[in-house]
Swiss-Prot record:
<dbReference type="GO" id="GO:0003735">
    <property type="term" value="F:structural constituent of ribosome"/>
</dbReference>
<dbReference type="GO" id="GO:1990904">
    <property type="term" value="C:ribonucleoprotein complex"/>
</dbReference>
<protein>
    <recommendedName>
        <fullName>Small ribosomal subunit protein bS21</fullName>
    </recommendedName>
</protein>
<keyword id="KW-0687">Ribonucleoprotein</keyword>
<feature type="region of interest" description="Disordered">
    <location>
        <begin position="26"/>
        <end position="64"/>
    </location>
</feature>
<dbReference type="GO" id="GO:0005840">
    <property type="term" value="C:ribosome"/>
</dbReference>
<dbReference type="Pfam" id="PF01165">
    <property type="entry name" value="Ribosomal_S21"/>
</dbReference>
<dbReference type="GO" id="GO:0006412">
    <property type="term" value="P:translation"/>
</dbReference>
<feature type="compositionally biased region" description="Basic residues">
    <location>
        <begin position="43"/>
        <end position="64"/>
    </location>
</feature>
<comment type="similarity">
    <text>Belongs to the bacterial ribosomal protein bS21 family.</text>
</comment>
<dbReference type="InterPro" id="IPR001911">
    <property type="entry name" value="Ribosomal_bS21"/>
</dbReference>
<dbReference type="InterPro" id="IPR038380">
    <property type="entry name" value="Ribosomal_bS21_sf"/>
</dbReference>
<keyword id="KW-0689">Ribosomal protein</keyword>
């Protein structure tokens, strides 16, 4: 869980901004969205394999 403590004389807006940044970096919201619906293991594997293929194609394009 993202834990943000207020610093000296820090406004609520800046603390909220730090909290939102930390939540984004930790991937908490994307994880929660992913877990809202059940995904069958074969579907999960397909999605991950497709992502790996996309990354490999992108790396190959960048290398040339």
């Amino acid at each position: 869980m993202a834990d943000v403590r207020p610093e000296n004389n820090e406004s609520f807006e800046s603390m909220l901004k730090r909290f939102n940044r930390k939540v984004q970096q930790d991937g908490i919201l994307s994880e929660a969205r992913r877990r809202t619906r059940f995904e069958r293991p074969p579907t999960r594997r397909k999605r991950k394999d497709a992502a790996k293929r996309r990354l490999a194609i992108k790396a190959a394009r960048k290398a040339t």
